Amino acid sequence: MPILTLLLLILGLFISPSVSDSRGDTVAQICNNRTTTPQQRSLFVTNFLAAMDAVSPLVEAKGYGQVVNGTGNLTVYAYGECIKDLDKKDCDLCFAQIKAKVPRCLPFQKGTRGGQVFSDGCYIRYDDYNFYNETLSLQDRTVCAPKEITGVNRTVFRDNAAELVKNMSVEAVRNGGFYAGFVDRHNVTVHGLAQCWETLNRSGCVECLSKASVRIGSCLVNEEGRVLSAGCYMRFSTQKFYNNSGNSTSDGNGGHNHLGVILAVTSSVVAFVLLVSAAGFLLKKRHAKKQREKKQLGSLFMLANKSNLCFSYENLERATDYFSDKNKLGQGGSGSVYKGVLTNGKTVAVKRLFFNTKQWVDHFFNEVNLISQVDHKNLVKLLGCSITGPESLLVYEYIANQSLHDYLFVRKDVQPLNWAKRFKIILGTAEGMAYLHEESNLRIIHRDIKLSNILLEDDFTPRIADFGLARLFPEDKTHISTAIAGTLGYMAPEYVVRGKLTEKADVYSFGVLMIEVITGKRNNAFVQDAGSILQSVWSLYRTSNVEEAVDPILGDNFNKIEASRLLQIGLLCVQAAFDQRPAMSVVVKMMKGSLEIHTPTQPPFLNPGSVVEMRKMMMTPTTNQSNSSGSRSDYITEGSSFFEPR
């Protein structure tokens, strides 16, 4: 391909609209200035994780939610809300995106005890005090677009914007805290939206929007303005940025015939066009980072061509019936997966990636670059990709039984897994992970081992899927330091608290998965007062009754000695100290009976003993480094952070 064409392709990928965009791009991330002591950090982080785990289903169910978790000065107050013009799908996606960013304010990152993230589609906040009735705070922001209106339309635009701001502050209160509309006079249109958070009563909404109207006045000659307050959100723009426009207009005579509407939540997908000027700004301000991303995209394109991995975007559209909901197999924080049938009759799984931020580049590059270079019976096989359409697509072999999570906890039309199948699934998963860690040409940490990422073939051979969060592990490092990414409940304590990543983080995740499969129960360590299945198994192990933890649906139809051995291995994998967890190759040998099983010496994560251990880990410098200097040059620092809701 000519170099000019390739460059145009790359630029097009950065600025093309995506039908999957949910206005999730961050407008502002604000971390407060209240710090916490090292002794309290682990408990505060634990309460934060539980609160985040609990607030997500509330937002998914009704568009907003608040959660209080913990006691005393370690209490975490959490809140999330979507802008009311978003449909449910876009609300869920938007919230997943900003939820991934708020941990950057956590004590192990910034040393603070509160933070909030504003996007143009949703909002999230956590703090160590009850902020639910706040209308204003010292951290409120006014954000004006850098470009001003010029020429003969400047005065008209300013007047229209001022009128619209007045309309929004009045009509939103009348309409239950939400208003979206526009003013169009003298052929100049200004669009706007205002919303009070559900935590405010009517008087609080009036106060918040009244103050927002004053603050946004400083932006009236700019192309766009926003006010980000503790109790409300207000925005105007030259562009229509909301869904299903209302009819709030002013006629050319300057009358006051304003009709406010509450926009209905729709099933349409949000189209959020990245402006060319914004793309140019990013290219100038982040030149080095864009060069890296271009290099990655060029590598992807050459890799796809060299290995015959290229698929036509149009063919994949037709194969999935244009991404019909009836063909949808599932959705995570990085994209949706659809069943498709190619023209040759082959059934495939097509992953449709969301790429409205830099994150899609890393995720897509990881998937194609890593999984195309590994080959194992327990890894999902990548068949190809498409990077020539409006969004990036990955094509995998189709696994009929879907995920282990669905088979255990969702599907009601299947027989429960018997003991032999559970053993086969656990062993196959362990063998696949041992290959990734030690046997492949690359040293790969998956970072997101969980039930929903284990797919099952017809004969129940497990396949490890989703390499979007995977990391290559340098041969000359004992660990790398990275922002946390993964799934709550499966992440190792040293990774949650310090961002310290080794293969042993995957081992911990495997241990959780292993115990979940054997017990038929999910690990609820991050749900307040729910208890942890890891703690339950440990307690039974201490009293020599560990076989009682086996899924009761099996009755007596399982090998008690074998079950006890596997649960003991699971406990070894979830020990609080990472250096006491076995390597995956050792796990495989212990499962096959060719190696003695050691005795766990520590309780699993989140019981009192492990909390003490976490405190020690946070207060003690790391000693397991590639040299004794302790220099930060021993680390590779990664900036991205990504959570997928469970």
Curated annotation (Swiss-Prot):
Entry-linked CDD domains: Gnk2-like, STKc_IRAK
SUPFAM superfamilies reported in the protein's UniProt record: Protein kinase-like (PK-like) (SSF56112)
Modified residues (Phosphotyrosine): Y396, Y495
Assigned keywords, A-Z: ATP-binding, Glycoprotein, Kinase, Membrane, Nucleotide-binding, Phosphoprotein, Receptor, Repeat, Serine/threonine-protein kinase, Signal, Transferase, Transmembrane, Transmembrane helix
Membrane topology recorded in Swiss-Prot or TrEMBL: Single-pass membrane protein
Record EC number: 2.7.11.-
Catalytic activity: L-seryl-[protein] + ATP = O-phospho-L-seryl-[protein] + ADP + H(+); L-threonyl-[protein] + ATP = O-phospho-L-threonyl-[protein] + ADP + H(+)
Residues bearing carbohydrate: N33, N69, N73, N133, N153, N167, N187, N201, N243, N247
Domain Protein kinase: 323-578
InterPro entries: CR_Ser/Thr_kinase (IPR052059), GNK2 (IPR002902), GNK2_sf (IPR038408), Kinase-like_dom_sf (IPR011009), Prot_kinase_dom (IPR000719), Protein_kinase_ATP_BS (IPR017441), Ser-Thr/Tyr_kinase_cat_dom (IPR001245), Ser/Thr_kinase_AS (IPR008271)
Enzyme class: transferase
Region Disordered, residue ranges: 621-646
First and last residue of the signal peptide: 1-20
Primary location: membrane
Gene Ontology CC entries for this record: membrane; mitochondrion
Active site per database record: D448 (proton acceptor)
Composition skew (Polar residues), residue ranges: 621-640
UniProt GO MF annotations: ATP binding; protein serine kinase activity; protein serine/threonine kinase activity
Transmembrane segments annotated in the record for this chain: 261-281
Disulphides: none
Ranges facing Cytoplasmic side: 282-646
Record localization: Membrane
Modified residues (Phosphoserine): S452, S481
Binding site for ATP: L329, G330, Q331, G332, G333, S334, G335, S336, V337, K351
Similarity annotation: Belongs to the protein kinase superfamily. Ser/Thr protein kinase family. CRK subfamily.
Protein name: Cysteine-rich receptor-like protein kinase 3
Native source species: Arabidopsis thaliana
